[in-house]
């Protein structure tokens, strides 16, 4: 067996002296790259190995209740995507083996059981992922097995887009300008059409196996498909991508309109049912939409460079803000019962579908932090537990952006008025009436002015405002100024 090696296929470099020799048995670990098309790590493994075994590992720290950020919607979507992936691999003559346990223990077990010569996977960049992959590397080194990694998840690898001082950008615009310059953008590969033809399977019984059917019932409270916005899997992803290409031609003009459909691709990108390169290619002329992909890269860079943002403000002085946590107000916010229609519509959409329009995410987040004066960390965790497309880097980045504590964040004194947001982005209250049926027969002007008009609709079962916005805005400014004056 060969010695342990780490490589990045983005640079097509492998420092191992024996890499010209064909590897007999390879093991590819799927994570959030659940497709066999344009999967860099998988294609790398296929090109280097005679036989390629494929696996997925459910880990207790991610899919059980010990994970306080676990989303049942995300886990369900992931398992559906794994079912689709399993079918695709079976059609190619292979088998997707699924396990439950610690990554290093499962890898050690399989190296012995299948006589594995090299382990392949696509790199991830969160603190958890980095430690996980280190543990696999240690096992592989002890067993004299290669580890070969690839960069697949982002347009450009986190940590590679640097400023003139060779440091990570903390502002989006200079990051974006640099990343989209020829010097960097030339490294964005086109999607690959190569096929994997050497999937393998075994007749051996492998320990710690867990079927996807069992995983679905064991690790999730299943949300009926009729309620969710998107279903998992490559086939569903392709349909959504084709629909998005047709519907998003005017994205720059409509993306903030709460009643207009968005791309609905975020979960497919998160779990790799689509490659980021496929999405980039089809929308390459849609500058505003592509810009959103770069925000995703930006937040991945921030988390990679500043891992302390998970659990702490990126800007340390924001840790001194004295939040006014009101448990009852927080409960009303989570249930969509604050008496602020534009806020409640967003939260009800999230609770029902596992998804929320991006503009609604900003509105609801701002309301929690700068109107209810509740810490962004509570909102970050609640969103994480509900979102199908939950991504730690993006979710954390967006919440800290709203709070003012993150990279390139809005200033603390910028506070969204729910009424003005309603006027600007749902003037006819179509979005609100979709998610708050109690208001379906109420005039739009009364909904927009619900803070005063609710007294004229006492027969309506919808909540009256739990607080006075103007008063809370004043308190928010005092709360922040106590730290920053």
Label every model-predicted segment.
Residues 43, 138, 344, 362, ...:
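A broad detector of short, well-ordered amphipathic alpha-helices
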